[in-house]
Amino acid sequence: MESKKQDGFSPKIVGYMCNWCTYAAADLAGSSKLEISPHLSVIRVMCSSRIDFNLVLTAFFNGADGILIGGCHPGDCHYDKGNYYTRRRYALLKNVLDTLKLDPERLQLSWISASEGNRYAEVVNNFTEKIKKLGPNPLNGNPYF
């Protein structure tokens, strides 16, 4: 099962961010000099619907302790229905993580618009604290899970 928090644990969090909304909110948060956790590595994708099972599972198998997916609010997708596809895929991914005995709380989906820099900082910081409490990813370096 899950590892408990270890002293000195520094989580590795991957953030897949929609180019049109969440990535722009990250830029706004940075230019507003908001305090944001340094444990997040942001990867810009054109739409949150581009994040598939392979991207998420590969990140976990390669040592990510948590994954944060950021997309446009439902109904505001630049590509019309992309975030609806994301929401369905996210629900399936949570089930897959549970099957792998990896706490589904290590994966989070948040809708953050381009003007929500404060919300972006809040979501990132709260998710980082959640991952710190969960401890290191138990799948990291284990080829047999």
Task: Walk through the language-model features, giving the residues of each.
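Iron-sulfur-associated redox domains of electron-transfer enzymes in respiratory
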Residues: 1-145
